[in-house]
């Protein structure tokens, strides 16, 4: 039986702004673009975020830099380190999010739990909501330890997005789906983020298992960077998250828009 996330204890209804934006219609694949707040500067990340928001993406994920980013590959790690060296903070990242959110595309924050705890979770939730953020991903926050942080996010009308990995067992997938709102994030590989030539075999079985347990949109991330990847994902998930490839473009003084437009051609 499909687990309606709106029925999970204290969870948000399924039809949030984020869920509506990412739900596939007619088999099309939605695209979520990732940038790092403060990379290479606060102003530049806002400018890039606005350009990406106007490029046809369904949502934008903004990373909050952290000194110990366990899930980040080398490209995103470098971006985070540079942002920290330039003085980016949680408060600064919320300002970046506010600047990008004005464009109308849903903004999702990706943050590790320690910066949130250091900032004050209740304050973080309130200010993220005021900034126009739609949801938050905390990859190192287990469901069993999610309260009271997830409760404060819910009270601020923010989706809490949890992740499913290739190694996640079916009963655990059901639990994750019942606690997620906005969408469920499927990690395509075991390990860290980063551009890859090929996506792993067997990932479609994971997507199918997740869909048994939720009516939320299902997004795939980690290693997605090519049109071939988008074609392989289309019809199996609702959305694809592209991160390292865009951050690499920004490293080269670009904005990732040309890459996004090329990828979007393979989404329909």
Sequence positions of predicted segments:
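Alpha/beta catalytic cores of nucleotide-metabolism and tRNA/nucleoside-modifying enzymes
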Residues: 3, 7, 206-216, 225-268
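Alpha-helix-loop-beta-strand connector modules within alpha/beta enzyme cores
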Residues: 75-108, 152-161, 165, 202-218, ...
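Hydrophobic faces of well-ordered beta-strands that scaffold small-molecule active sites
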Residues: 31-35, 60-62, 107-111, 136-138, ...
């Amino acid at each position: 039986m499909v687990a309606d996330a709106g029925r999970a204890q204290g969870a948000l209804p399924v039809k949030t702004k984020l869920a509506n934006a990412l739900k596939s219609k007619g088999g099309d694949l939605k695209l979520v673009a990732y940038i790092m707040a403060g990379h290479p500067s606060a102003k530049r990340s806002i400018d890039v975020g606005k350009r990406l928001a106007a490029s046809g993406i369904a949502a934008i994920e903004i990373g909050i830099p952290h000194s110990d980013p366990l899930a980040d590959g080398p490209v995103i790690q470098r971006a985070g380190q540079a942002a920290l060296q330039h003085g980016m903070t949680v408060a600064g990242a919320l300002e970046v999010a506010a600047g990008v959110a004005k464009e109308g595309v849903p903004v999702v924050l990706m943050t590790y739990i320690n910066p949130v705890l250091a900032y004050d979770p209740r304050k973080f939730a309130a200010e993220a909501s005021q900034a126009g953020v739609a949801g938050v991903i905390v990859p190192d926050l287990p469901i069993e330890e999610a309260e009271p942080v997830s409760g404060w996010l819910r009270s601020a009308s923010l989706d809490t997005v949890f992740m499913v990995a290739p190694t996640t067992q079916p009963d655990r997938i059901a639990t994750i789906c019942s606690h997620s709102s906005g969408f469920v994030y499927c990690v395509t590989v075991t390990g860290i983020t980063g551009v890859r030539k090929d996506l792993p075999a067997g990932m479609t079985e994971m997507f199918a298992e997740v869909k048994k347990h939720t009516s939320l949109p299902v997004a795939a991330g980690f290693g997605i960077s090519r049109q071939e990847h988008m074609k392989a994902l289309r019809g199996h998930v609702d959305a694809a998250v592209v991160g390292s490839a865009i951050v690499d473009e920004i490293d080269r003084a670009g904005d990732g828009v040309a890459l996004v437009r090329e990828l979007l051609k393979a989404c329909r």
